[in-house]
């Protein structure tokens, strides 16, 4: 609602008007200026136009059983399906309300048959309309209302009303009648739980007067006026209870006659609004209030027609469907305590706006009434193709569905997304007008019938007539071509000139007549088949805007013959004789509405109040805002396209509701500069400075990306700009709109509708849009245009409906570079980091797979082989990855990839190819649109080079750490900021109190992996050299407990050793920290990431489904801005990191043991003494700043400072910044405007927080944690990138160990193939690759095809890899683990102190009901598998002799998944050991008990968790 009003205003501040009435009517006055430009001269007329509106109407309102909506109730009392979790409610009664167990059990039995229906829309509508009627009373404007009579000298129309205005009431009274009505039985209620099945209202925050108001709104509503919102309504419930501290008796006394009407009057409008505010806020009914406000606004008023035919519109009344009332929110006192669930961001925003300015509802109703009538008329115009043809392909089915009837009309009129009502089976519709050619007969008094279709004293009107001109939403892109409603158009020459006039197309004739009437001329015409005698275009004398003539929908009328142009008595602008070839001049007409005010009667004039989006920000504290995709299509919108009207979920990429398929062929390279597409233009951006830099554009084809409109046009930097470059179009394309050097109008392209300012450059126009424009409510293509400018996409192609032209330009497609001769596969080398076990697929295997897919795919791969050979790229992993990529790439992208000069032409060698791939894909991210033309398959092409390319400059690394370029922030403000964040976590985070003994007892489970280093000789006794033994897992588990606890005595410092991490397409420096700092830090800040989960998706909250949901929540009703830090680790000063640690220590010091407090002080001091061993000189140097990548606190520190820098820079204080997510150096911000992104970059620059501008994507990609969350992949989560999947498919991570079991290998292969299937559309390629992987497994491990097949199909409880619910259990996979060989440097894990300590801890957890040695053997066996050397495991399959038992295990598989709170569960599961630490706490104790009751508790835990 708020966004619709704001979008349809002239600037970002909206004009708002309070309800007013003069006998049911008011008038909106507008001051208008129209410019006429011809012969390099400009003439203008400033004049006033007005539009009457009537509040009179008689809608038919039906109350039907609707759906129950429990949004706003605390999350913990709801099920995953959105129902009420009764068990949780009963547990709450026992635990916090002090209700005895037998009383709770009895209550549970009583409520088994109760209904849990909750819907407050009917009550909220009663309260909202009572408020508006009371405002009229206080203004002295309350009356029954009447419809004004129409009299134009030809006909007279007077429509009857039910109640005579002179005999009607003069003030609002209670809508019920105590003398005749029966009232609901209500009673005050304050107990902990209900006793009868009736609605329970929760009105605890309301005053007695406000409670009385709510009670009366539950009563029957009698219609006492003719106003549309004063509709008849039954009492909302026969019985109900209200939860309040006091028994309110005023209403009862009035009903019983103990109080007079004067003693019990309706409260003032302020009290009503206060009651409404408190009721909605306390019950958290934001979604339902949104629905109520939408419905009321849609029926509140209609425009009073200024033509006789328009009165047919007033004869049709709406059919409104409202759900019956129900309430369960007051049944229990705690249902509304805690985080509210399922609140819509759009609803929350509208609620905030309406409570700030209630006038928003009335203003929205004015705009809707105009757009509804105009849209219904345009439906017929578009459906009939301007009368020239019946367009059966034009989709207008949205008009036939009641839930989308109004929204279809709004979208048809404005070209914008029209928001739905937010609830199913709730609607406003006009059933008599479902067919666009419905006939209406208007009773009239005939004075002069010429020009009217009159039959039996009735005016016959076909379809919905035009009742008004769209002043309230002007300018509006009502058509895809230039027209008077868009704000700017050009009068073109006639089709042909005759002796007595000129012949025009129908639309051109309307444009001509419209302009002439404003200038002071009448236009006479003739059309074929006219039988009514109409000879002049009609315009009301009150506004002079000519209506769209009725004949445009007549299929028999092809052209209009303009016979004469006659000067009126009141003439304003002298124009040439436009219907004469000798005097014709091309005339450009521009219209602007300057201001608006409303008037109700002679002396009641109301000027607009203003509301600014900057001051309307939903308060999200304690509210879980969800995304539209999780509700249903009723939280979506309706959009107008060239094919018709389409409905779809808001911002839900998975449905691709607005995608259009274009027939596209790649143009020849030499042809790419001409034609309609502007693909090679020079877009300039002046540098940022204290004053705008002026540019004189002399070179053709040069356009400023950012300009400032003041008294003149200036090319400026983005920080100073008011407008940004949006599109470039040929002058001929918009010649109907403008021929001037500068002009503003509403423009509808094939992919977007937006208000633009056109600036002429030679024979083209650059279209500019205000930087403060709300881009979220525009189309995806419009956001793509903005992203291209913001990210400076050099190869972006303007004036094209598809992104494919831009791709062809960015990749510089040239078919001539494709190989003509093929020599086959070459001999390929392996990079030094690639061991045998890291490679899964090789080039020959991929070519063989391609042959099974299709000959064409094999041809594509052979082309790649030759292209790579020409570039001298012979790395096996890179070749295999690129082959896998082309094998799985969508068909439409393969040619432009193979024919790309930007990729395949240039310096030879892997590094040069990597650089070109990186440069190309970087631009592609900025033109991606998730819900229009997704390009995720082309992201991150540099990843295709896989591992082993690139290098690390250790001298540069050293320079960065000795001379750091860090963010500059005030440390006192940083401490306060971070401390507040940590304090806010105490509701959800509990600091883990422990001693050294507790900590070391569980070290087997929490010990981190990775290489181990120590600067102390005594630690080296437990560090075992060797590829498989020099790691923290072995070292820490070999150490006795006392050795670890004594580490605290060492000086506080952090020592780091350098190493290289081989990543996709690059190498990165890694700094592995010393063992002691790692263990002490982990002890002091155990699971410290959990302190951030209340605010950021880290730790357990970083799971893919949770992150995807969180990001979708954030982007509901907003767009994304991905801020990319430049080498974030190097931007932290030592002072900033020390401050963060001190804030953590001071926040949780009271929760620490003495040993933890000592360790925490050690950690704080250690960050001041950080040293790195130079790999070249082998000397230690002390860090002057920056963060070490291998530190225990890397993610924690990066996440905290990531958020803190933005907080201190003032990013979150910017008006348009709505929300953000942070994890490590990743950050995504939700916003709506280009200007906001510019201000964010500026704010971060001021504190020296560096970003990579080219990677800061605005509106295009919603990337967070390397996943595009703007669209859904095959698994229903965010879409990941094909290039990454191909790289993983070919080559393992360097850190991974050699797989020891065929089952483990096949399990990993299955996961990789599943990821690949979610990212590619070539499923046949996935099948062929799977066959190659299985073939490779049988060869390496020496197993038969039948065993591989059995492993694929058998359920996991039988040793297979299938997780299907009904996977077979008849076959069991046998693995001989005893055949593993462990390194000779280390003894058997059964003798390790860490294994013994952990086994003892688990034994104690089981209550000593399980043999200690059995537990120890299991832990030792899991440890043994981590250090095994060779593939000596024997895998066989045989018939399962205990199939019945396996069926039970299959049934219970993962039955308690998610209940175990073990932080390091993945480690345990990998070792085939169930996660055991902490499972005796919380809900996980149920899993513990279930395991103990089983015959084999260890096996049971493994299955059920």
Swiss-Prot record:
Catalytic class of the enzyme: transferase
Superkingdom, natural source: Viruses
Family indicated by similarity: Belongs to the totiviridae RNA-directed RNA polymerase family.
Protein name: Probable RNA-directed RNA polymerase
GO molecular function annotation: hydrolase activity; nucleotide binding; RNA binding; RNA-directed RNA polymerase activity
Keyword tags: Hydrolase, Nucleotide-binding, Nucleotidyltransferase, RNA-binding, RNA-directed RNA polymerase, Transferase, Viral RNA replication
Alphabetical GO biological process terms: DNA-templated transcription; viral translational frameshifting
InterPro entries for this protein: DNA/RNA_pol_sf (IPR043502), Major_coat_LA-virus (IPR015302), Major_coat_LA-virus_sf (IPR036332), RNA-dir_pol_luteovirus (IPR001795)
Role this protein plays: RNA-dependent RNA polymerase which replicates the viral genome. Catalyzes the transcription of fully conservative plus-strand genomic RNAs that are extruded from the virion into the cytoplasm where they function as mRNAs for translation of viral proteins and also as substrates for encapsidation to form new virions. Once encapsidated, the positive strand is converted to dsRNA by the RNA-directed RNA polymerase. Displays ssRNA-binding activity.
Pfam families: LA-virus_coat, RdRP_4
């Amino acid at each position: 609602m708020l966004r619709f009003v704001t979008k349809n205003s002239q600037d970002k501040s909206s004009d708002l008007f309070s309800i007013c009435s003069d006998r049911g009517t008011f008038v909106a006055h507008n001051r208008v200026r129209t410019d006429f430009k011809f012969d390099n001269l400009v003439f203008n007329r400033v004049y006033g136009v007005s539009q009457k509106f009537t509040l009179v109407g008689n809608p038919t309102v039906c109350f039907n059983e609707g759906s129950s909506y429990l949004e706003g109730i605390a999350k913990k009392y709801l099920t995953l399906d959105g129902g009420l979790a009764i068990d949780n409610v009963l547990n709450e009664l026992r635990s916090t309300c002090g209700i005895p167990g037998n009383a709770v059990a009895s209550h549970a039995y009583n409520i088994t048959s109760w209904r849990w229906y909750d819907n407050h829309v009917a009550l909220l509508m009663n309260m909202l309309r009572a408020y508006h009627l009371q405002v009229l009373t206080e203004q002295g404007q309350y009356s029954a209302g009447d419809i004004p009579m129409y009299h134009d000298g030809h006909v007279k129309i007077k429509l009857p009303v039910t109640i005579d205005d002179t005999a009607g009431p003069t003030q609002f009274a209670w809508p019920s009648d105590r003398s005749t009505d029966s009232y609901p039985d209500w009673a005050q209620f304050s107990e902990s739980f209900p006793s009868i099945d009736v609605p329970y209202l929760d009105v605890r925050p309301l005053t007695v007067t406000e409670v009385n108001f709510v009670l009366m709104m539950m009563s029957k509503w009698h219609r006492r006026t003719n106003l549309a919102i004063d509709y008849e309504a039954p009492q909302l419930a026969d019985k109900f209870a209200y939860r309040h501290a006091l028994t309110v008796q005023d209403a009862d006394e009035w009903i019983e006659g103990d109080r007079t009407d004067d003693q019990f009057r309706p409260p003032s409008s302020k009290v009503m609004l206060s009651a409404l505010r408190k009721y909605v806020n306390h019950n958290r009914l934001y979604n339902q209030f949104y629905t109520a406000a939408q419905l009321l606004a849609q029926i509140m008023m209609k425009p009073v027609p200024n033509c006789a035919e328009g009165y047919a519109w007033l004869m049709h009344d709406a059919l409104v469907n409202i759900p019956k009332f129900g309430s369960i929110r007051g049944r229990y006192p705690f249902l509304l305590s805690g985080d509210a669930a399922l609140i819509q961001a759009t609803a929350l925003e509208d609620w905030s706006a309406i409570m700030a300015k209630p006038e928003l509802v009335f203003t929205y109703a004015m705009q809707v009434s105009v757009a509804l009538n105009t849209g219904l008329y345009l439906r017929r115009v578009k459906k009939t193709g301007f009368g020239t043809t019946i367009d059966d392909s034009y989709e207008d089915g949205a008009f036939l569905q009641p839930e989308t009837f109004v929204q279809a009309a709004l979208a048809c009129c404005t070209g914008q997304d029209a928001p739905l009502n937010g609830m199913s089976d709730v609607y406003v519709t006009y059933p008599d007008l479902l067919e666009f050619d419905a006939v209406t007969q208007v009773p009239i008094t005939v004075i002069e019938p010429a020009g009217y279709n009159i039959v039996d004293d009735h005016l016959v009107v076909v379809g919905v007539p035009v009742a008004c001109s769209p002043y309230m939403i002007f300018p509006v892109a009502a058509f895809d071509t230039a027209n008077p409603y868009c704000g700017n158009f050009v009068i073109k020459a006639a089709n042909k000139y005759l002796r007595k006039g000129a012949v025009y197309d129908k639309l051109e004739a309307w444009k001509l007549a419209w302009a002439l009437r404003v200038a002071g001329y009448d236009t006479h015409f003739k059309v074929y088949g006219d039988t009514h005698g109409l000879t002049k275009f009609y315009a009301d004398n009150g506004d002079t805007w000519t209506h769209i003539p009725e004949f445009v929908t007549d299929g028999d009328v092809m052209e209009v013959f303009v016979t004469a142009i006659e000067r009126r008595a009141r003439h304003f602008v002298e124009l040439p004789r436009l219907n004469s070839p000798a005097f014709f001049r091309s005339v450009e007409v521009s219209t602007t509405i300057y201001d608006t005010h409303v008037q109700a009667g002679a002396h009641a004039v109301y000027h607009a109040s203003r509301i600014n989006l900057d001051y309307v920000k939903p308060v999200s504290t304690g509210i879980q805002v969800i995304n539209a995709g999780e509700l249903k299509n009723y939280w979506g919108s309706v959009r107008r396209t060239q094919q018709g009207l389409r409905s779809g979920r808001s911002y839900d990429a998975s449905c691709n509701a607005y995608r259009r398929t274009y027939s596209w062929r790649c143009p020849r390279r030499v042809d790419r500069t001409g034609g309609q597409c502007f693909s090679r233009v020079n877009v300039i951006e002046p540098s940022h400075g204290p004053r705008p830099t002026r540019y004189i554009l002399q070179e053709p084809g040069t356009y400023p990306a950012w300009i400032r409109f003041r008294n003149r046009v200036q090319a400026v930097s983005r920080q100073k700009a008011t407008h940004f470059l949006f599109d470039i179009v040929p002058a001929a394309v918009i010649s109907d709109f403008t021929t001037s050097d500068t002009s503003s109008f509403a423009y509808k392209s094939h992919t977007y509708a937006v208000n633009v300012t056109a600036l002429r450059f030679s024979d083209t126009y650059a279209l500019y849009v205000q930087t403060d424009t709300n881009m979220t409510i525009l189309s995806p293509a419009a956001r793509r245009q903005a992203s291209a400018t913001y990210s400076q996409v050099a190869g972006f192609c303007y004036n094209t409906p598809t992104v494919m032209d831009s791709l062809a330009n960015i990749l510089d497609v040239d078919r001539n570079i494709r190989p003509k001769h093929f020599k086959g596969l070459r001999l390929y080398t392996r990079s030094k980091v690639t061991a045998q076990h890291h490679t899964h697929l090789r080039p020959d295997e991929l070519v063989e797979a391609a042959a099974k897919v299709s000959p064409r795919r094999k041809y594509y791969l052979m082309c790649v082989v030759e292209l790579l050979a020409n570039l001298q790229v012979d790395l096996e992993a890179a070749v295999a990855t690129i082959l896998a990529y082309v094998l799985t790439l969508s068909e439409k992208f393969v040619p432009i990839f193979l024919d790309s000069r930007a990729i395949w032409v240039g310096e030879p060698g892997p590094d040069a190819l990597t650089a070109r791939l990186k440069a190309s894909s970087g631009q592609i991210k900025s033109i991606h649109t998730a819900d229009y033309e997704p390009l995720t398959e082309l992201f991150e092409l540099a990843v295709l080079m896989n591992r082993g390319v690139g290098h690390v400059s250790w001298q540069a690394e050293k320079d960065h750490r000795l001379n750091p370029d860090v963010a500059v922030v005030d440390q006192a403000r940083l401490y306060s900021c971070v401390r507040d964040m940590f304090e806010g976590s105490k509701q959800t985070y509990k600091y883990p109190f422990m001693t050294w003994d507790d900590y070391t007892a569980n070290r087997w489970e929490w010990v981190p992996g990775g290489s181990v280093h120590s600067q102390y000789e005594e630690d080296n006794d437990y560090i075992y050299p060797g590829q498989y033994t020099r790691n923290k897992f072995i070292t820490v588990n070999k150490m006795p407990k006392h050795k670890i606890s004594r580490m605290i005595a060492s000086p506080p410092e952090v020592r780091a050793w350098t190493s290289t991490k081989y990543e996709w397409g690059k190498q990165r420096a890694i700094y592995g920290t010393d063992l002691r700092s790692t263990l002490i830090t982990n002890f002091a800040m155990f699971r410290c990431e959990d302190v951030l989960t209340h605010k950021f998706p880290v730790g357990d909250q970083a799971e893919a489904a949770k992150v995807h949901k969180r990001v979708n929540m954030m982007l509901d009703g907003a767009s994304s801005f991905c801020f990319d830090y430049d080498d974030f680790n190097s931007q932290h000063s030592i002072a900033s990191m020390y401050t963060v640690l001190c804030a953590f220590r001071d926040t949780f010091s009271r929760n620490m043991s003495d040993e933890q407090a000592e360790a925490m002080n050690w950690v704080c001091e250690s960050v001041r003494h950080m040293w790195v061993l130079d790999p070249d000189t082998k000397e230690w140097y002390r860090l002057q700043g920056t963060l070490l990548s291998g530190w225990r606190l890397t993610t924690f520190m990066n996440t905290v400072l990531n958020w803190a820098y933005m907080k201190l820079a003032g990013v979150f204080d910017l008006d348009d910044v709505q929300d953000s997510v942070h994890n490590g150096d990743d950050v995504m911000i939700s916003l709506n405007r280009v200007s906001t992104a510019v201000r964010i970059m500026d704010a971060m620059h001021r504190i020296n927080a560096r970003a990579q501008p080219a990677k800061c994507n605005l509106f295009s990609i919603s990337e967070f944690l390397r996943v595009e969350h703007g669209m859904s992949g095959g698994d229903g989560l965010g879409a990941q990138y094909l290039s990454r999947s191909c790289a993983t498919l070919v080559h393992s991570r360097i850190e991974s160990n050699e797989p020891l079991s065929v089952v483990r290998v096949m399990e990993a292969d299955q996961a990789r193939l599943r990821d690949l299937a979610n990212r590619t559309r070539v499923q046949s390629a996935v099948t062929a690759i799977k066959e190659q992987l299985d073939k490779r497994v049988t060869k390496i491990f020496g197993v038969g095809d039948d065993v591989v097949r059995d492993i694929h199909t058998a359920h996991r409880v039988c040793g297979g890899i299938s997780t299907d619910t009904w996977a077979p259990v008849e076959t069991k996979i046998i693995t001989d683990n005893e055949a593993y060989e462990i390194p000779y440097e280390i003894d058997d894990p059964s003798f390790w102190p860490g294994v013994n300590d952990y086994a003892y801890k688990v034994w104690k957890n089981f209550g000593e009901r399980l043999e200690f040695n059995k537990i120890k053997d299991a832990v030792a066996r899991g440890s043994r598998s981590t250090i095994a050397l060779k593939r000596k495991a024997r895998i066989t399959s045989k018939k399962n002799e205990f199939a019945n038992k396996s069926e039970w295990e299959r049934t219970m598989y993962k039955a308690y998944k998610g209940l175990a709170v073990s932080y390091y569960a993945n480690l345990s599961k990998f070792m085939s050991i169930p996660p055991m630490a902490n499972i005796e706490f919380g809900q996980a104790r149920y899993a513990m008990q279930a395991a103990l009751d089983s015959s084999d508790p260890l096996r049971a835990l493994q299955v059920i968790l």
